[in-house]
Amino acid sequence: MAFTQALVTVLAFLVGTLPHKFDFSENSDLKKANGDKCVHHSQCFSDCCLIDLERSGAFCTSKSHVGMACLPQTKRSLNILCPCRIGLSCHSKDPMCPRRCQMI
């Protein structure tokens, strides 16, 4: 079970580093709703494609709310944590604690 989860994680990171053959531009009318399967964050209306090991894949989900763990920005195709919603910033007051969404 642990090996399978590790393999899924490694494959997800590799997919994030490969060039994509599809057009996932911001102007695309094919944006997916929360809960739909995705392979790139720009496919999602929320702009967050989150890896879900329990459901064996990646799915569109909303960005992080106040107090939720976050990433400062989306760099690859898939997210382990989502960036913050508009109006919130992702930072940590303590370098030993994970980043959280907070009011600007």
Swiss-Prot record:
Gene Ontology annotations of biological process type: digestion; lipid catabolic process; response to food
PROSITE patterns: COLIPASE_2 (PS51342)
Disulfide bridge map: C38-C49, C44-C60, C48-C82, C70-C90, C84-C101
Major location category of this protein: secreted
Signal peptide: 1-19
Subcellular location: Secreted
Protein name as catalogued: Colipase-like protein 2
